[in-house]
Amino acid sequence: MTIFGPDISSYQAGLNLAKLADASFVIAKTTEGTYYTDGDYEGWRLQAAVLHKPFIWYHFLSGENAAAQAAHTAANVGDKSLPGMLDFEPAGSFSPTLAQAVAYVDAAHAEGLNLRLVYLPRWYWQQIGSPDLGALRDRGLQLVSSAYPGGTGSAPKLYPGDGATGWNGYGRMYPLLYQFTNKASDGGQPLDYNAFRGTTPQLVAALNPAAPASVPTPFPTPTSMEDDEMPAFATGTIEPGKDAVTVVCPPPPGTGSAGWGACWRWGRGFIRS
């Protein structure tokens, strides 16, 4: 199964999500740099919540300080638990570097944002030298690719299929989402549309961090002899026997305030000797 979702911004101002026939999820622009907040973002976020559609925010990267950009996103995203996407592509005379993208990712995570995706078209990845994208992958991000075969019509009609070249990996990452058109007709407007190979619950699971593994109970810090009245050391050997193995010999009798010193062996039961 493959599902579809639009990528929208103020260019689609006034779009009513309830009128979208093909949207199983929604991606909407929230911020750009430190200077811009999308005026339609909050309304779309609330519409998606009412419609129970997975909602993804995105930030358009600028050349400004990464921490300042992340703080700007955090102040406007509305719900930090929502999954987010970094839009990593050039604009005007600015061409972002991989280092700038990684810096924003780190700053966003430090702000508590659930940044999970990076939109990086293959052509721009090639333009910046076809780098290994392990730094993004290792930070928990998944790739969104783009390639437009052309044509007009609905998103399902334009989708080139699960085997399309837009699904091919690069930089040692493979796309979780594939933006396959910028001309899908839906809701009365031409829209960018993305595909996900899976179900809506599978997409939700992929965009949310896994539950943390259980943390082993720390090994207790040794207490003083006064605390437990047992010496903090032992002597002796481990010796094989027919029915028993000597495991631990504490110090000689009378050592410590409790007079420890007996030897315990493991055999058919605990045997004191």
Language model segments and positions:
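Flexible, glycine-rich phosphate/dinucleotide-binding loops
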Residues: 35, 64, 125, 152, ...
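Short C-terminal domain-edge/linker segments immediately following a structured domain
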Residues: 57-59, 120, 208-212
